[in-house]
UniProtKB/Swiss-Prot annotation:
Zinc in keyword set: yes
Biased composition (Polar residues): 337-351
Domain PAS per the UniProt entry, residue ranges: 475-546
Organism: Neurospora crassa (strain ATCC 24698 / 74-OR23-1A / CBS 708.71 / DSM 1257 / FGSC 987)
Subcellular location: Nucleus
Protein name, per record: Transcription activator of gluconeogenesis NCU03938
Recorded superkingdom: Eukaryota
């Protein structure tokens, strides 16, 4: 019967015969009898097509048979017929069968983990054999019967339904071979109220689109699945085996690089020259020159963008201004003029952080003359006067960021810190406060590191000293936050020993307030530590030959003032009335200060990462009135004890009263304790409990036994910059202290 075969049957047999030579991607084996029949029919058909040249037959079950490279995605016709397809569109099989116009990518069954992925993310990676001249569209997940008589120029094949289209690029742009011409999207998207189609996509340019009023009350999504530009990645350059893996990598690049940025106001993206909604040739995300006006404007800041919608643009992310709000993808770079990747221009200013910018930052302008390219709706916005009230509203107030701005440090510091004057004040304090042996020991410790200071400072000029102070303030900016989060009492000092920062725990422990320590309030402390046997024994070991002398006095500048005792007292009184930061030497007793500076000489330039753990005695903050009241209370408490002939004779004074149980206190002692509690940073009830059982009771003779650890942080010039100290009070049951 080979002579009775008609042309139509020959065409069908030719298609079937090729299926015998080419193998299905699923490697479906047929039965033996079917193979024999197919081979007989293919001999006759191949004789007609190849003019007698028969192709070599391979056994389908032969494991050594040559295998053809499978296509990434089979077309719909080849997929339905279980035939091997190619990467080109239309494929060779559809061309032979006359189905070239309807050759579309087939619909694959999604895996479970891909059910939530949009259909656009599951497109195949277009290979090098992709034909851009053919009109190809992306499937939308719906199958329709094929029609061989459909137009070749139609944007949607016969298998898919019509939909409003958003082409990614305008017709004026360079034609791409890696992206289809038109991308279909539904007309309504519940996730994306910002991308509204126009009433007639064939008429006019986008201009100002209409946004429905119910949609204005909802903020737009950060990643809009209906935006075609969100899936526009350079998939060829990523060398991914699957479309979904490349898209996942691109989306991670979106989230990691620009999720914290504000929506860019890009007026240049609205300048379209075609009749479709398209993107300009500077890139899908429009990262050309001069696109940023100001990151945080006082009048049009982040709050006004979230709470109100601009009447000129009909929404925060309207199509008229194309403020799509999508972050910039730094993870997939490309050239500035590339149209295949959402890259950012290297010469365009970009916001680099979110939460540390100054609210009073100046406008970002790319090149001169860029103001003429701005649309008219944004020019009056820049001419509005700035209001100080709105200037404080930044991203911190919306997102709960910290309110402090480190950029103010670099604007406020104009002069270097006078460390020389501070060292002179320290030496004067040591001479007036400590004995001669302790003063000489401290001065020797400081003199041992003086050559290192001089070698590091000799090449520094005024600009370096100002930079040094800015570095100190910037480092203190970070350490203050750590100190406030630390549960232990902590202070931060300069290299001269002046207190620069303190937390509330230290104030609760010692009674020294922050204003007094930082020099904002006058220091009225009268507790100098006294003189006890421990201090004298430690002080006698140091000094000049172990001799304990009196405190030396500095010679007056004017000899006539030296004989007048009243003038000296008046001058010292004026010096005390000037608030100044408290030195570390004023917070500890004499022996602790001497030991501290001995360790300081070892750590200043020798051990850059070293720490010191010691025990010290901190001095409680007591004014002269508190000390007089404590002395009166101690005298009143010792009188009944002496007359009764019982009780302890060596009671210690604690917060204005003897160290006894709370029930044994007299009425004369309670006002003093209440007065101390009223000056505390705690509430009244908590302060009352703290005054009886809390941390303020751990003292003896106005001193606190503490263990402390400290380290030194150096600056860029390798000079000691900040001394960080943490304290922990010691509890001794033998000292009749109450439990904390």
């Amino acid at each position: 019967m080979p002579d009775d075969v008609g042309p139509a049957e020959a065409e069908v047999s030719g298609a079937v015969s090729e299926s015998d030579n080419e193998y299905d991607e699923t490697e479906v084996t047929t039965k033996d009898d079917d193979d024999e029949k197919m081979a007989e029919r293919s001999v006759a058909s191949e004789g007609v097509e190849t003019n007698g040249d028969q192709k070599k037959k391979y056994d389908p079950k032969d494991p050594l048979r040559p295998r053809r490279k499978k296509a990434r995605r089979a077309c719909y016709a080849c997929q339905r017929a279980h035939l091997t397809c190619g990467d080109e569109r239309p494929c060779q099989r559809c061309i032979k069968r006359g189905l070239a116009e309807a050759c579309q990518d087939g619909v694959r069954k999604k895996a479970k983990y891909l059910h939530d992925a949009p259909p656009e993310a599951l497109r195949p990676v277009l290979g090098p054999n992709y034909n851009p001249a053919a009109a190809v569209s992306v499937r939308n997940g719906h199958r329709h019967p094929s029609n061989a008589g459909s137009d070749a120029g139609s944007s949607i094949g016969t298998f898919y339904s019509q939909s409003t289209q958003y082409p990614v690029f305008s017709s004026a742009a360079t034609q791409l071979g890696s992206i289809p011409e038109n991308l279909p999207f539904p007309q309504q998207s519940p996730v994306s109220p910002t991308f509204q189609p126009s009433s007639n996509p064939q008429l006019g340019s986008i201009g100002v689109s209409s946004v429905s009023s119910p949609m204005n009350s909802f903020p737009p999504a950060l990643f809009d699945p209906s935006n075609p530009a969100i899936f526009n990645f350079n998939l060829e350059g990523l060398n991914f085996g699957s479309q979904y893996g490349a898209m996942e990598f691109g989306m991670l690049g979106h989230m990691s690089s620009g999720a914290a940025e504000t929506p860019p106001r890009d007026p240049s993206m609205a300048q379209q020259g075609t009749s479709d909604v398209g993107f300009n040739p500077s890139g899908v995300f429009g990262n050309g020159l001069n696109q940023f006006e100001k990151v945080y404007d006082n009048n049009t800041g982040l709050i006004s963008d979230f709470l109100t919608l601009d009447a000129h643009s009909n929404g925060l992310y309207s199509q008229g201004n194309l403020q799509h709000g999508l972050p910039h993808a730094y993870a997939i770079p490309a050239g500035p003029t590339s149209l295949q990747s959402p890259s950012t221009e290297n010469n365009s200013p970009q916001p680099t952080g979110f939460g540390f910018e100054s609210p009073t930052a100046t406008n970002y302008t790319g090149v001169p003359g860029a103001a003429g390219n701005q649309p008219g709706s944004q020019q009056p916005r820049a001419q509005k006067p700035k209001t100080p009230a709105l200037g404080k509203l930044g991203p911190q107030s919306v997102l709960g960021k910290r309110q402090r701005d480190p950029s103010s440090i670099y604007e406020a510091v104009k002069e270097p810190f006078q460390y020389v004057a501070s060292f002179h004040k320290l030496i004067s304090l040591l001479q007036n406060r400590f004995s001669g042996a302790s003063t000489i020991s401290i001065v020797r410790s400081l003199a041992s590191i003086r050559p290192s200071f001089m070698s590091c400072m000799k090449t520094l000029n005024r600009a370096d000293l100002i930079f040094m102070e800015k570095s100190f303030q910037r480092a203190l900016f970070e350490h203050e936050e750590f100190m406030h989060q630390s549960p232990s009492p902590a202070i931060a000092c300069r290299r001269t020993g002046e207190i620069a920062a303190v937390n509330k725990e230290f104030t609760a422990l010692t009674g020294w307030t922050k204003d007094v320590l930082l020099g904002k309030t006058l220091n009225l402390n009268a507790n100098m530590g006294g003189t006890n046997s421990d201090t004298l024994s430690i002080s006698s070991k140091g000094g000049r030959g172990g001799i304990v002398g009196t405190t030396p006095r500095l010679k007056p500048l004017h000899p006539e003032q030296g004989t007048n005792a009243d003038s000296q007292q008046q001058q010292s009184q004026q010096h005390k009335e000037q608030p100044q930061p408290v030195f570390l030497a004023e917070l500890m007793d004499e022996a602790s200060v001497t030991q501290f500076y001995e360790d300081y000489a070892q750590l200043a330039f020798t051990h850059s990462r070293g720490t010191v753990v010691r025990k010290c005695r901190l001095l409680k903050y007591r004014t002269q009135e508190n000390m007089d009241a404590a002395a009166a209370a101690a005298a009143a408490a010792s009188a009944p004890t002496a007359s009764g002939g019982s009780g302890s004779s060596n009671g210690t004074v604690v917060n204005g009263g003897p160290d006894s149980s709370p029930a044994g206190k007299t009425e004369k002692e309670r006002p003093t304790g209440v007065n101390v509690a009223s000056n505390s940073i705690l509430s009244n009830r908590v302060a009352k409990i703290d005054g009886e059982h809390g941390i303020s009771k751990l003292e003896r003779d106005g001193k606190l036994e503490c263990s402390y650890t400290w380290t030194i942080k150096r600056d860029v010039f390798d000079i000691p910059m900040i001394i960080m100290i943490n304290f922990l009070p010691c509890y001794y049951r033998s000292h009749n202290q109450l439990a904390v």
